[in-house]
Regions:
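Active-site neighborhoods and metal-handling regions in enzymes and metal-associated proteins
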Residues: 1-252
Length: 252
C-alpha cells in the first residue's frame, strides 16, 4: 500500500483548505430550512466557493459527478445529487458534504443538519453519529492502527443499536482527492495499517438506524439504505501528528 506522508508545511496548507470547506458548511446553516431545494443550496455553495473563497469545488466533474455538494436526505447514506426537484421538508435530516481545492490541496468535510422540528429518534441518530466520528478521531496517534479507529466507531454505534455502513469508507487525502489508505469505520483493535506522523485521511462514519445494507439508485450515485430507514454521517479530515492528531477541517 502506497500513501504520501505530508510535511508540517503541507499540513498547514491542508488546514487552510479544510478551514475553507468548513466555512462553506457554516455559511449554509441559515439556508437549510423547510422549502429550500438542494439545487438552490448547491448554487449558493458554488458561488461562495468560487467567488468568496476563490477555491475550486472538487466534486464537479469528479468521476462524472455533476454538482458542488453531495446532499443526502433521510434514508440517503451518501452521494445524493442536488436538484431543483428535491425540496427539504420539516422533520428531514440532511448531510451536506463538500470538498474544496485551495492552492492544490483538498479540504473535505461533511455535517448533518436538522430541518425544522425533527423527531427525537432522528435527532438521536444524528447525535450518536457525531459521537462515533469523534470516538474514531480520538484513536488517531502514531502507533495506533486503522482497526483501532474502526473498532471505536463500530463499538459505539452498535452499543446504541445502530449499524455501520460497510460499503463506503474514509480515505487518504492531500493533493489527490482520494488516495490510500482506505479508512473503514468498523474493525478490530490492533489490526490494519499502523498510523505514523504525516498521514492525512478522512474519517466519515455512515451510521444507519436499521441494517447496514445499502443500494445504489439508477442515477449511479445516490446510495440509500436497503431497508429505507434513516442514515446519518459526519466527516472530518485529520492529520497524524508527532503526539496525536489534528483536525484539519475546523471553521473560523
Amino acid at each position: 500500500m502506497s500513501f504520501s506522508l505530508k510535511s508540517k508545511k503541507d499540513i498547514e496548507k491542508m488546514k487552510i483548505a479544510g478551514r475553507k470547506a468548513a466555512n462553506v458548511l457554516e455559511m449554509l446553516t441559515e439556508y437549510v430550512v423547510p422549502g429550500v431545494t438542494t439545487g438552490e443550496l448547491d448554487d449558493i455553495a458554488f458561488k461562495f466557493i468560487t467567488e468568496k473563497l476563490k477555491c475550486i469545488p472538487a466534486n464537479i466533474g469528479y468521476s462524472g459527478f455533476p454538482k458542488t455538494l453531495c446532499t443526502s436526505i433521510n434514508n440517503v447514506i451518501c452521494h445524493g445529487i442536488p436538484t431543483k426537484d428535491k425540496t427539504l421538508k420539516n422533520g428531514d435530516i440532511v448531510n451536506i458534504d463538500v470538498t474544496v481545492i485551495d492552492d492544490g490541496w483538498h479540504g473535505d468535510t461533511s455535517r448533518m443538519y436538522l430541518v425544522g422540528k425533527v423527531p427525537a429518534h432522528a435527532k438521536r441518530l444524528v447525535d450518536i453519529t457525531k459521537d462515533c466520528l469523534f470516538a474514531g478521531i480520538n484513536q488517531v496517534k502514531p502507533g495506533a492502527t486503522l482497526g483501532d479507529v474502526g473498532f471505536a466507531i463500530q463499538h459505539l454505534a452498535e452499543k446504541n443499536h445502530y449499524s455501520v455502513v460497510r460499503d463506503y469508507c474514509g480515505h487518504g487525502i492531500g493533493k489527490t482527492y482520494h488516495e490510500e489508505p482506505q479508512v473503514m469505520h468498523y474493525g478490530q483493535k490492533g489490526e490494519g495499517l499502523k498510523l505514523e506522523e504525516g498521514m492525512c485521511f478522512t474519517i466519515e462514519p455512515m451510521i444507519n438506524l436499521g441494517s447496514h445494507h445499502s443500494k445504489v439508485l439508477q442515477d449511479g450515485w445516490t446510495v440509500v439504505t436497503k431497508d429505507g430507514k434513516l442514515s446519518a454521517q459526519w466527516e472530518h479530515t485529520v492529520a497524524v501528528t508527532s503526539n496525536g492528531h489534528e483536525i484539519l477541517t475546523l471553521g473560523d
